[in-house]
Amino acid sequence: MQEGKISQIIGPVVDVDFPEGQLPSILDALTVTRQDGSKLVLETQQHLGEERVRTISMEGTDGLVRGMSVANTGRPIQAPVGAEVLGRMLNVVGEPIDGKGPVPSKKSYPIHRSAPKFDELSTKAEMFETGIKVIDLLEPYSRGGKTGLFGGAGVGKTVLIMELINNIAKEQSGYSVFAGVGERTREGNDLWHEMMESGVIDKTALVFGQMNEPPGARARVALTGLSIAEYFRDEEGRDVLLFIDNIFRFTQAGAEVSALLGRMPSAVGYQPTLGTEMGELQDRIVSTKKGSVTSVQAIYVPADDLTDPAPATAFTHLDATTVLSRQIAELGIYPAVDPLDSTSRILDPNIIGNDHYDTAQAVKQILQRYKDLQDIIAILGMDELSDEDKLVVARARKVQRFLSQPFFVAEAFTGLAGKYVKLEDTIKGFKEIIAGKHDSLPENAFYLVGTIEEAVEKAKKL
């Protein structure tokens, strides 16, 4: 094993000198043994001349000193894979952080792997039911597809991701991998305890590199989670779910690493390699003929600006987008999904059927008409509208409220039992509202209920 010596430490950047001709390859993992016997992992990023490499640390560099010995592992960071990682919480280098002892996995994958070849990819389009009305009706997720949850600060991205994990794990009993990338540690802790209570934890692997970690860990933790998911897809032929919260932090950490390595920044201070890094990650999240990886990625939108380079780069890779809107959250409608801004590639009658497609288009049409009429209502009031338009507004407001739904993971906050709504019940409910079958019911009856039958029951109590 080649050994080198630390020559310079600048925060998370560590320069290491090796004897001439023994430089580690780019992306190879190096290990430093601290005085207390624990190991710190560095990842090789640049070759500076004949004998020096510049590395990024995966943990804080406190306690490191110049002259310390560094060992070259001769391969990239390895993630433990297989059934042994289910029910466990790991960090970026695959070490357990749940206090349950070592992970006895028989196999490990490098976190840097090439994407599957074109001829191995699967191209079939199939809808994936989530039990959340607004998603299933208007922007259906595809099995083996990529979905982005876009939203500014505090509009409910993490709650929505947690609800999806809950619904899918309970209803579809598939394996899930959750990668917590640069988000709040409290949220990771809540997720861990909720999963243990609901029993979902046995089918989930969690990988965390949260806000308090150095940028190297945050820039790599998504890849660790992805390698675990790839094992289940390629070697066990499973349909896996990969949740990443938050993909923006992956880009943000990449920008920090890029600046630390002295690269010239590009637009808005992001790294010049933004598109490449995102592409390398997203190109691995695909479905092959062996199995599928269905991914749901929360994407923070800085200052609610969807044209910012980070969310804009992520947009190009997605099959469906769920855009969370502050205006809708302000109305108290949760999940605060913008039904007119959200899209899906499989919202196509050939894939989802005419009944679903026609209902979705009718819902979008009535909401768009209501949006167009809002200026007139704001200036002249409701009385100036024609009878036909008054009817449109009344039905649109009912549709808008019926798009809300009580969540299982938010029961403690709302005091309402969570609801999983099957697709046929969702379609039936919206068809009836648009056809005018429930014109006599107050709009409040449709707020935070599951099926249309529940709305009718609620109306009797109002």
Swiss-Prot record:
One of its GO terms (cellular component) is proton-transporting ATP synthase complex. PROSITE patterns: ATPASE_ALPHA_BETA (PS00152). Keywords: ATP synthesis, ATP-binding, Cell inner membrane, Cell membrane, CF(1), Hydrogen ion transport, Ion transport, Membrane, Nucleotide-binding, Translocase, Transport. One of its GO terms (molecular function) is ATP hydrolysis activity. It catalyses: ATP + H2O + 4 H(+)(in) = ADP + phosphate + 5 H(+)(out). Its EC number is 7.1.2.2. It is a peripheral membrane protein. ATP binds at G151, G152, A153, G154, V155, G156, K157, T158. It is found in: Cell inner membrane. Its main location: membrane. Pfam families: ATP-synt_ab, ATP-synt_ab_N, ATP-synt_VA_C. It is an enzyme of class 7 (translocase). Produces ATP from ADP in the presence of a proton gradient across the membrane. The catalytic sites are hosted primarily by the beta subunits. F-type ATPases have 2 components, CF(1) - the catalytic core - and CF(0) - the membrane proton channel. CF(1) has five subunits: alpha(3), beta(3), gamma(1), delta(1), epsilon(1). CF(0) has three main subunits: a(1), b(2) and c(9-12). The alpha and beta chains form an alternating ring which encloses part of the gamma chain. CF(1) is attached to CF(0) by a central stalk formed by the gamma and epsilon chains, while a peripheral stalk is formed by the delta and b chains. Belongs to the ATPase alpha/beta chains family. This is ATP synthase subunit beta. It comes from Chlorobaculum parvum (strain DSM 263 / NCIMB 8327). The lineage of its organism: Bacteria, Pseudomonadati, Chlorobiota, Chlorobiia, Chlorobiales. The gene is atpD.
